[in-house]
Swiss-Prot record:
There is a cross-link at K423, K467, K478 (Glycyl lysine isopeptide (Lys-Gly) (interchain with G-Cter in SUMO2)). One of its GO terms (molecular function) is sequence-specific DNA binding. It is found in: Nucleus. SUPFAM superfamilies: Glucocorticoid receptor-like (DNA-binding domain). The keyword Ubl conjugation applies. The GATA-type zinc fingers mediate interaction with LMCD1. Expressed in myocardium, vascular smooth muscle, gut epithelium, and osteoclasts. Residues 494-534 have a biased composition (Polar residues). This is Transcription factor GATA-6. Residues 17-47 have a biased composition (Low complexity).
């Protein structure tokens, strides 16, 4: 494989005697002039897809580099304390220089493959840890910050800073390749869930078999997400192992996911191409590097490019990222129909949104309720079973449950019979009946038609005269017009007379007739009559006490409001007036 002038592919093998065992830091001593600078391009690769030369796969080492790797500079010892206690490292790895732990007594150790390509030196480098025999190393309790000192440049490119976070982890070579997605990708997929849902994600379909291809009996980690090609603006390149032939290159190995952001980024774009606002192409690894037990390199990661567009449609959703929990392998999705037709179906999509989007153009159903039932009843075409009416202010039911209009239902309820369908003809006014004439005076105009003893129709005047006098009405009394009485309103004058007596002094003379007194007494209320009787009695007692004829003015205060004062001319007039009034008979008795 031809490398660029500025690029290099230099694996370092550190033996047990390569460095001093007393080094305590992860990188205790660094050579300032050494070309092993961790700064490398995120999209660097030792091998492109298909360009597998003598340096591809496991042939990337040269004899000169092997000699240098065997010797090893004394100041480059590594302290891999997080991996010293790995059970698989104890079984397959040798004692690392400066490592105290179960794996310190072994004969061989891991290879550190450093890849860089200086054609894209602006992006940050990533370290790819490849384990020749160790598989699926667990999460490190604490990752040294010096390994990721160059990732500080990534913090300015994405929403989250991944540099120097304690609790970050790098598995082994395959795990690093799995976590080597872009650090600032807008959508995050949990690494603990990727393995179980690779079959559902179209842009990660090819990587589903990757972690399971490791030989050596470690078992595939369900949460490995496979590396893919990356673009420089998103600060990460797809990582392939030593000699991996992924389409995006393999030099961007160790994307550091901190404990604050335990999600591996979604597949980014390939080979630094400009991102399309509508979407980007993700090159997912198909092989994911089947690591052999004796070899120390990853197999070729084939590039299957899956294009999914309109990712920007998911970005304005208030920055919400769809997370899949580790405990549920497949759970009912809460996102529905694809935001755009080109969006591939995934496990986080639900039929609920499909149904909502499908009914976007359809009118919303009217909620059911009493008012809805009433509207439905009114909208239905009902018909009265009796008269056939379809409109009525109130629908009623008969005993059998059939609908009746308000008139028929009420008639049936009141009379117990069905309402007759034939309406009776309106009665013609008696004064306008054709062919009718009085059998006595032969008039055709009257206010009321009567019948005589023989049953013949007579006018109101002839019928009333016959009823009162028992003889037919004489024709001489016939008049052309109908004479009506001009009736005055009842109780108007009489009420005025009674009120006048109560408001002022009224001279009571003997000429007053008893009929007027009777009428006034009849028209007044019983309380007024009782009051009047009391007044008469008090007046008589006053007259009996005062025998003086000159004292004709009597004033009393017992009945206020009825008579203020009564002026009498003489006792004789009073006596005669009282005797003539019938209402005073009880008082005199």
């Amino acid at each position: 494989m031809a490398l660029t002038d500025g690029g290099w592919c230099l694996p370092k093998r550190f033996g047990a005697a390569a460095a001093d065992a007393g080094d305590s830091g992860p990188f205790p001593a660094r050579e300032p002039s050494s070309p092993l600078s961790p700064i490398s391009s995120s999209s660097s690769s030792c091998s492109r897809g298909g360009d597998r030369g003598p340096c591809g796969a496991s042939n990337c080492r040269t004899p000169q580099l092997d000699a240098e790797a065997v010797a090893g500079p004394p100041g480059r010892s590594l302290l891999l304390s997080p991996y010293a206690s790995h059970p698989f490292a104890a079984a397959h790895g040798a004692a690392a220089p400066g490592v105290a732990g179960p794996g310190s007594a072994l004969s061989t150790w891991e290879d550190l493959l450093l890849f860089t390509d200086l054609d894209q030196a602006a992006t940050a480098s990533k370290l790819l840890w490849s384990s020749r025999g160790a598989k699926l190393s667990p999460f490190a309790a604490e990752q040294p910050e010096e390994m990721y000192q160059t990732l500080a440049a990534l913090s300015s490119q994405g929403p989250a800073a991944y540099d120097g976070a304690p609790g970050g982890f790098v598995h082994s070579a395959a795990a690093a390749a799995a976590a080597a997605a872009a650090a600032s990708s807008p959508v995050y997929v949990p690494t603990t869930r990727v393995g179980s849902m690779l079959s559902g994600l179209p842009y990660l379909q090819g990587a589903g078999s990757g972690p399971s291809n490791h030989a050596g009996g470690a078992g595939a980690h369900p949460g490995w997400s496979q590396a893919s090609a990356d673009s420089p603006p998103y600060g990460g390149g797809g990582a392939a192992g030593g000699g991996a032939a992924g389409p995006g290159g393999a030099g961007s190995a160790t994307a550091h996911a901190s404990a604050r952001f335990p999600y591996s980024p979604s597949p980014p774009m390939a080979n630094g191409a400009a991102r399309d606002p509508g979407g980007y192409v993700a090159a997912g690894g198909t092989g994911a590097g089947s690591v052999s037990g004796g070899g120390g390199s990853l197999a070729a990661m084939g590039g299957r490019e899956h294009q999914y567009s309109s990712l920007s449609a998911a970005r304005p959703l208030n920055g919400t990222y769809h997370h899949h929990h580790h405990h549920h392998p497949t759970y009912s999705p809460y996102m529905a129909a694809p935001l755009t037709p080109a969006w591939p179906a995934g496990p986080f999509e639900t039929p609920v949104l499909h149904s909502l989007q499908g009914r976007a153009g359809a009118p919303l159903p009217v909620p059911r309720g009493p008012s809805t039932d009433l509207l439905e009843d009114l909208s239905e075409s009902r018909e009265c079973v009796n008269c056939g009416s379809i409109q009525t202010p109130l629908w009623r039911r008969d005993g059998t449950g059939h609908y009746l209009c308000n008139a028929c239902g009420l008639y049936s309820k009141m009379n117990g019979l069905s309402r007759p369908l034939i309406k009776p003809q309106k009665r013609v006014p008696s004064s306008r009946r054709l062919g009718l004439s009085c059998a006595n005076c032969h008039t055709t105009t009257t206010t009321l038609w009567r019948r005589n003893a023989e049953g013949e129709p007579v006018c109101n005047a002839c019928g009333l005269y016959m009823k009162l006098h028992g003889v037919p009405r004489p024709l001489a009394m016939k008049k052309e017009g109908i004479q009506t009485r001009k009736r005055k309103p009842k109780n108007i004058n009489k009420s005025k007379a009674c009120s006048g007596n109560s408001s002022g002094s009224v001279p009571m003379t003997p000429t007053s007739s008893s009929s007027n007194s009777d009428d006034c007494t009849k028209n007044t209320s019983p309380s007024t009559q009782a009051t009047t009787s009391g007044v008469g009695a008090s007046v008589m007692s006053a007259v009996g006490e005062n025998a003086n004829p000159e004292n004709s003015d009597l004033k009393y205060s017992g009945q206020d409001g009825l008579y203020i004062g009564v002026s009498l001319s003489s006792p004789a007039e009073v006596t005669s007036s009282v005797r003539q009034d019938s209402w005073c008979a009880l008082a005199l008795a």
